[in-house]
């Protein structure tokens, strides 16, 4: 066929249509050229004619483009006009790159690695940057040599996310989606044909499509309808979607999991250590379904104990390269909201095939210890096993055994404690196992504390829920001996597995916890001084000892939750990495996560690496595993945020029935816009706005971390006891508003 020259596309004016990508490329080339001229002679100023001459620009269209770019670069604070029409490049040291943290009031703070203080950015200088974005910020000259820097966002380098949760507000031919996140300072403009079936009032997921320079709001498209606000499922799905977390399982992954061979075969048993005859049991929360771990116990002829820590062998079923593994990696963790669990694995695996349910043979990965009566590890064996759990205990049941039973005798768990709501008989050999393990756990814990471990027994807020998932009461979960028994043996297994691989000097996944920042510890010390406490910060040992003494001393006191929270905030965050630095909080030189592969992907990686190295495989690619570690750390952080939001939501919902009621509370936070108060009896936290404190005009004193009345000098500080009235509850924002009561 003969080729013909196609006519060029014509615009409405009849002129050839511009090649947008070419124009964009030409623009970027011109900007680079402008900077090359200005940076070559940084002390001089150049007007557009001089720059044009240096760049050999002679035609009028390109000169016009040059003038336009100079004006835009000046507006973006990339160059400065030192004299009329004369420009200089702004030195790059006046720019910083960091992560934008937007407050609920709409202002932002850019967090820059290496800077002691964040850079404040007023809302009108955010320039379309959103919470969590990686940004470039220009610092205003008058603030450069001060502790408090202020600036303007000059460039969004990377969006944190493009999908947001909000509520549809319909207009005639368009709609706005109002975000649920108070840190989002703009609505989304959505054309009618981009609503995809969403109606007025629907809660939806909206994706940013475009945000034009002169538009106040970004253009969006509705991707998913979550439901009607106020419905429990809608609200929980909204929380998950806000953090980019899934709430359903892809059908193709579920189908893949259902086709797996889940049987226990003789061939596979032959490849494993068979421990089905050894006494084995699980201790878990009352409502648990995913039993990751079990303990086995046997008295040896030499008087020592054989103690097995047996972990669900998830990697036997979840193979690398499958869609099942890909989905598990993407999720990286199970998410535990107040009223539901969003599992990392399909239900057929997490609650059935992998779960170490009683009276079923299971494939496990085990660390088996020989331990003497001093809780010293004499010998260790690590490898794949097959086990059989004979008993399943709730923590309350095991605690009942610890408190009431005697060695050498059987024990009956009372009906009111039993998970069956009936009396349960516990054989004498199981009683002996639990009591002996508890004694050994206490010794293990004592050793850790002497080495400088820190014990955080922060109070966990739990809710009584009715059949519709609505909160009817609040209670606090305590960590007792049964919890600590399991904790100590899981810590032991995690530590010993990490030490075992570390000796090989091969790539591995570690859970590390850096030393706390000295300034944060000093700030924490300053706050607790107001309660009459103090820390000895001379060295690591005195620091950890005094923190432990403090945490023990505040137990049961009104300030306990505040002190516990501030202590945790003063610490670094634990993360996953291939580069081991030890675990400060646990006082371990080596530590990993081996014990929860049903709900944590790093544990799956640990199992795989461990088996490879047991089979004498070479070290695996470090860069690949470091990337997976970072992803896992990020996903666990997002999951923790979602879990906190679900608690806040339930607290607000619970307090709806208590509007206008008065409660005693403790000031848990102080800001320039008000004080946060935590109600003592239920740990619900709300805001008393500074403008609502009518007896004076209050301003924030940063040095004393207090709101101070300008006329009276009256102060509101962290830890002060106050009486409040519940003024308002906002379920959408998950916020409580309080007012002070005289």
Predicted stretch roles:
Residues 117-122, 184-190, 683-700:
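A short macromolecule-binding patch
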Residues 2-308, 315-364, 392, 400, ...:
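Charge-lined substrate channels and their catalytic hotspots, especially those that engage the 3′ end
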Residues 53, 205, 211-212, 238, ...:
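Electropositive polyanion-binding surfaces
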